């Protein structure tokens, strides 16, 4: 029988100094011993990128009872890999990535460093979740996000998650949400993605921008609709991306 407190690994893609991750630390600190291992600066949009051509390093920023904070020169996924392989003395009981400044709904899950880190935790068989607020402001109000994130973290610590499954929680920018809906990921894509400009030399340069366009037909239980209706969305995600329904058809192809 062990009396060890749960070990919770926290990371993000906005960097160790972002308000979101520090609000997350405050709302989870009574649930277990926290180890924060996060990028030393913004790494948004990194997805599951890893660093392979240059060395990475980490720096201890703070150590006190129940809380240790490191910064890392790598990507969010690098942070998870390095923390679990080289720094932590035991496997975490939970990984929480966030709180992200900005939403990670629909196909954004494929680009998100926040969700890339959560997926990496899942690959290590650590129950993992990403938490995002639909507000990019540096001083955003994370109150509702913290309330829901903490509630979900407590439940995951108690119940665990199925093998290969991790969670994606998104919270709208509202003083109070209507509730929490378990959803499917919205289908669609980004359109008008680049804004063309010129640099000082007159050469064309491009800024990433764009708008999300939902695919038709729109499923009524998707995360975008839930968020637009004032609900927080919770999507269970899978590491295994195999299309099992298409396997039989593919086997019948003449290759």
Curated annotation (Swiss-Prot):
<dbReference type="GO" id="GO:0004309">
    <property type="term" value="F:exopolyphosphatase activity"/>
</dbReference>
<keyword id="KW-0378">Hydrolase</keyword>
<dbReference type="GO" id="GO:0008253">
    <property type="term" value="F:5'-nucleotidase activity"/>
</dbReference>
<dbReference type="GO" id="GO:0046872">
    <property type="term" value="F:metal ion binding"/>
</dbReference>
<dbReference type="InterPro" id="IPR036523">
    <property type="entry name" value="SurE-like_sf"/>
</dbReference>
<comment type="similarity">
    <text>Belongs to the SurE nucleotidase family.</text>
</comment>
<feature type="binding site">
    <location>
        <position position="44"/>
    </location>
    <ligand>
        <name>a divalent metal cation</name>
    </ligand>
</feature>
<feature type="binding site">
    <location>
        <position position="14"/>
    </location>
    <ligand>
        <name>a divalent metal cation</name>
    </ligand>
</feature>
<protein>
    <recommendedName>
        <fullName>5'-nucleotidase SurE</fullName>
        <ecNumber>3.1.3.5</ecNumber>
    </recommendedName>
</protein>
<comment type="function">
    <text>Nucleotidase that shows phosphatase activity on nucleoside 5'-monophosphates.</text>
</comment>
<keyword id="KW-0963">Cytoplasm</keyword>
<dbReference type="InterPro" id="IPR030048">
    <property type="entry name" value="SurE"/>
</dbReference>
<dbReference type="Pfam" id="PF01975">
    <property type="entry name" value="SurE"/>
</dbReference>
<dbReference type="GO" id="GO:0005737">
    <property type="term" value="C:cytoplasm"/>
</dbReference>
<keyword id="KW-0479">Metal-binding</keyword>
<dbReference type="GO" id="GO:0008254">
    <property type="term" value="F:3'-nucleotidase activity"/>
</dbReference>
<feature type="binding site">
    <location>
        <position position="13"/>
    </location>
    <ligand>
        <name>a divalent metal cation</name>
    </ligand>
</feature>
<keyword id="KW-0547">Nucleotide-binding</keyword>
<dbReference type="GO" id="GO:0000166">
    <property type="term" value="F:nucleotide binding"/>
</dbReference>
<feature type="binding site">
    <location>
        <position position="100"/>
    </location>
    <ligand>
        <name>a divalent metal cation</name>
    </ligand>
</feature>
<dbReference type="InterPro" id="IPR002828">
    <property type="entry name" value="SurE-like_Pase/nucleotidase"/>
</dbReference>
